[in-house]
């Protein structure tokens, strides 16, 4: 074969190409590696971790959604790397699960403990609070969060509600008040009008915060009781 013919064979062969979507996942892995680098300042590592999460949200909104549309339309043409939309989705399912597992591992096994060593405690359970702090958290929920929570039940007469992109939502099993009927599924959107980070007044040099979704989870029975 001539040089030009060899170049044409390489250009037309899928084995010489990487799928665009899988390449993006590899890019997010490289960003995540920055969050895992112990030589980088702690808050910079947290920033890199948050970037990977934000990237993943946008990736699903645009690229994964586009692949799903093509699959639903019966589109079977292969991309330059030789993969159909369905094959790409299957490969992404594996690759993204690995990425998310690594995200959680980085946060829970490394960054979270470093935050605590530096005096920043992220509260996830009511039992982690002192009596005084618990009173503050309960009051904050009743005065600021509860008024803007709206549980939306899902049943045969009420289809699954439209979930906004990048919104935080909680799934809950609810039952009508004073009823023995079966539990029903409901969604509760975490209010976007409030700060996601709630600082808890505490004594000493430590700083305690609770995320709005965790605060809502702790009190989730309150808005669902009257249903």
Regions found by a protein language model. Name each.
Residues 30, 50-54, 58, 62, ...:
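Short, residue-level hotspots on alpha-helical faces of the histone-fold
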